[in-house]
Amino acid sequence: MTQVAKKILVTCALPYANGSIHLGHMLEHIQADVWVRYQRMRGHEVNFICADDAHGTPIMLKAQQLGITPEQMIGEMSQEHQTDFAGFNISYDNYHSTHSDENRELSELIYTRLKENGFIKNRTISQLYDPEKGMFLPDRFVKGTCPKCKSADQYGDNCEVCGATYSPTELIEPKSVVSGATPVMRDSEHFFFDLPSFSEMLQAWTRSGALQEQVANKMQEWFESGLQQWDISRDAPYFGFEIPNAPGKYFYVWLDAPIGYMGSFKNLCDKRGDTTSFEEYWKKDSDAELYHFIGKDIVYFHSLFWPAMLEGSHFRKPTNLFVHGYVTVNGAKMSKSRGTFIKASTWLKHFDADSLRYYYTAKLSSRIDDIDLNLEDFVQRVNADIVNKVVNLASRNAGFINKRFDGVLAAELADPQLYKTFTDAAVVIGEAWESREFGKAIREIMALADVANRYVDEQAPWVVAKQEGRDADLQAICSMGINLFRVLMTYLKPVLPTLSERVEAFLNSELNWDAIEQPLLGHKVNTFKALYNRIDMKQVEALVEASKEEVKAAAAPVTGPLADFPIQETITFDDFAKVDLRVALIENAEFVEGSDKLLRLTLDLGGEKRNVFSGIRSAYPDPQALIGRQTVMVANLAPRKMRFGVSEGMVMAAGPGGKDIFLLSPDDGAKPGQQVK
């Protein structure tokens, strides 16, 4: 059963260092950890790394609001993140930060190689500048009066009243969102990565058959829309790395973020005193395998920019991207008001890590499907599978072995053919773990657990124990049950690390994939102790209530949003009543050719279709992720003819702009076409 050992480097997407880890994050880290633990069990050389994504304007501004330095903020956040991941037994070999010497050196190296190879272009662009803060202002850090319809308090890229798009320089009486000052125009030289030069290479990589079908199909849509040059620079002040020989210019966060994978691995190699592995893993002709586990919202960056950057700087490309969907709770988006926006640390105060690891694993597949954490089903499944089927198998047999036979198992198997059925399943279960068909693996294992429990039911050791002269039969039956339990727990070891440690202590033997062919015969086990406790809905209720209380505590008066976006002048009810807000279903979402800001949305109002252009592309780089969501739109705006077509309304969104735009969604039960009052 031993395989040829492979060298594998596995990463998870880097959590942004301005917020806590929640159950949505944990899906990816659990998925990757289960896969990594399986690879290690099969004897492969696996390096599992991650880091905090620690750069960008949001980090800089939040640190200012907190009255601390960005370095202090990201340092505290890193400790919190690492504590959360350790609590869930995520077995990282290294957890680093993009704000590191290794990442700076590698970012500069890759940039220099791209520049030397002709893939960096310089272009002067005009931007608004905040004279008080001394900073250039992104489009959504400027507000003013719309030059088209004269509506006040509109962003610098498009009007949310009439739907017009424009440049920030066209705003009437523009104001800086950061300081309230009147901005001035300044030219600035920016640096662009020539992504279109890599179109053929990327298309060949897409057609290689390695990528998930859904990812390959989405990439094909992007190719058909045409790849654009990518602005990789930002002007000071900016928290990040300064571009070599370009004072006051900084690498955009999405340039150095994926390089953080390399930086974390370099840091690990340096800690080990390993001077060869970094080159072996990252050189262009490396025979090591490189896998990125990511969410579907960042496919654009990882499938286009990242492999192109690596190709242009003579490093190897990823072997594959393993993309997953989002997490919903009880069939809906995680909600702070309902207490279902649950932080990782809050979960661990009410449940153990293995319970969530098992539930997520049972629902995961290799497809990019959303996973629903139904809290009632969670309780039922954990109790039914882990407690009733698996742990109960051990408890039903261990007592007899401990009390009647001093913990010593029988010298022979009671049913060798049944045992072979269990060990033969290693092929199917192993293939399921390998291909990330986790749900299939769990189904196969639980089917075996049912067989094992039926065996015990039929043999009835509690009856045999009362019959004189049948001690050998009793020992054989219970030893068989414990050996079947051992095989099941070996298959489950990648999923349930804490339970596995307890089981290994009881069995007095390590759970090793390649050792299951040899049962434990004449082997002494330790005294059986309770391995896992049942859970109940009272714990769920306490968890939800605790999450609500955390939201209330965090909702104490703050100055940030209200200071940045003061409440506007009072309007009459009659003024408000003129605005017809409706629930709309997003039937389709796509890029707008010729615009780097707009998405074209096809909205269903419950029988009537609308075409709407919305300036939300910066926050939703994968429009496909919006399809099927409900949102709120202004339905009675006069249609406006734009360069790209006619816009028939406006969708509602919150946030300061850039990556921080959040499309509004109605609560559960709302239907397309219903009026929002």
Curated annotation (Swiss-Prot):
Name the enzyme group at the top EC level. Answer: ligase
Q: Which reaction does it catalyse?
A: tRNA(Met) + L-methionine + ATP = L-methionyl-tRNA(Met) + AMP + diphosphate
The reply on keyword Iron-sulfur is: no
Location of motif 'HIGH' region in this chain is 15-25
Q: Where is this motif: 'KMSKS' region?
A: 333-337
Cofactor: how bound: Binds 1 zinc ion per subunit.
Listed binding positions for Zn(2+) are: 146, 149, 159, 162
Amino acids binding ATP = 336
The catalytic activity of this protein is classed by the Enzyme Commission as 6.1.1.10
Task: Summarize the subunit comment.
Answer: Homodimer.
The record describes the protein's role as:
Is required not only for elongation of protein synthesis but also for the initiation of all mRNA translation through initiator tRNA(fMet) aminoacylation.
- What's the protein name? Methionine--tRNA ligase
What is the protein's species of origin? Salmonella schwarzengrund (strain CVM19633)
